[in-house]
């Protein structure tokens, strides 16, 4: 699950890093972009059709604040807005993400945080990139989490192992993801379940001598739900 107006970006930067005059301009890193995807697949789940997914990130000395969104061409697709505060050093990374996904015709209010009414989901992540392999663990710790077999908060979790490689002139990434215990948050997770097995290929397409367009294609399979997805995307 998983970009802001110029004014919002400025407020985010100021809140995180303090006065701009106190920080040298070349020490702050910022990026903005968007993906156009033929379908919205996330951790082995179908979350929508053709979507525009903008993002913006501001970082300083390993600390970062990012916003990400998704709006589907189909009006019945959820509208999503996520905020992530993270820190990384070397191969280590940790973050907290606030997911906010508004279902079609729902009246969910963004600043509604009351228990049993909010649609926010708060997730903690910790991981390490060893180079050949990256391992990440994610756990929902608050908000609209799923439930376990007893009807209690599941603290829904997900572990992902990914390995990048090159083949045939393309950049590839193979990954496998699983849920360690039962939760209604992930499709058909009745216990430990491998819910995402996928491979992504990406390449920069040359448009002109000075402009390239990153493109990617992802094939994924969810053994738990016996679902498969094939997504194509362009990054700007």
Language-model regions, residue ranges each:
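Outer-membrane beta-barrel proteins
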Residues: 2-8, 18-236
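Repetitive helical segments and hydrophobic/amphipathic motifs
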Residues: 12-15
């Amino acid at each position: 699950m998983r970009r802001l107006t110029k004014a919002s970006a400025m407020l985010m930067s100021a809140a995180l890093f303090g006065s701009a005059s106190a920080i040298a301009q070349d020490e702050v890193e910022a990026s903005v972009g968007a993906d156009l995807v033929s379908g919205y697949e996330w951790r082995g789940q179908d979350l929508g059709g053709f979507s525009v997914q903008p993002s913006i990130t501001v970082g300083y000395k390993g600390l970062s604040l990012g916003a990400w969104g998704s709006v589907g061409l189909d009006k019945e697709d959820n509208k999503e807005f996520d905020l992530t505060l993270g820190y990384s050093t070397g191969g280590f990374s940790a973050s907290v993400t606030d997911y906010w996904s508004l279902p079609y015709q729902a009246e969910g209010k963004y600043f509604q945080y009351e228990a049993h009414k909010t649609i926010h989901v708060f997730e903690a992540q910790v991981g390490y990139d060893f180079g050949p392999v990256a391992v990440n663990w994610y756990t929902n710790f608050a908000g609209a989490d799923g439930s376990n077999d007893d009807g209690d908060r599941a603290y829904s979790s997900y572990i992902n192992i990914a390995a990048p490689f090159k083949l045939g002139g393309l950049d590839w990434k193979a990954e496998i993801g699983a849920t360690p215990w039962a939760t209604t948050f992930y499709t058909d997770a009745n216990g430990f379940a491998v819910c995402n097995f996928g491979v992504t290929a990406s390449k920069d397409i040359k448009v002109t001598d000075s402009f390239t367009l990153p493109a990617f294609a992802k094939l994924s399979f969810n053994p738990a739900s016996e679902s498969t997805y094939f997504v194509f995307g362009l990054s700007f």
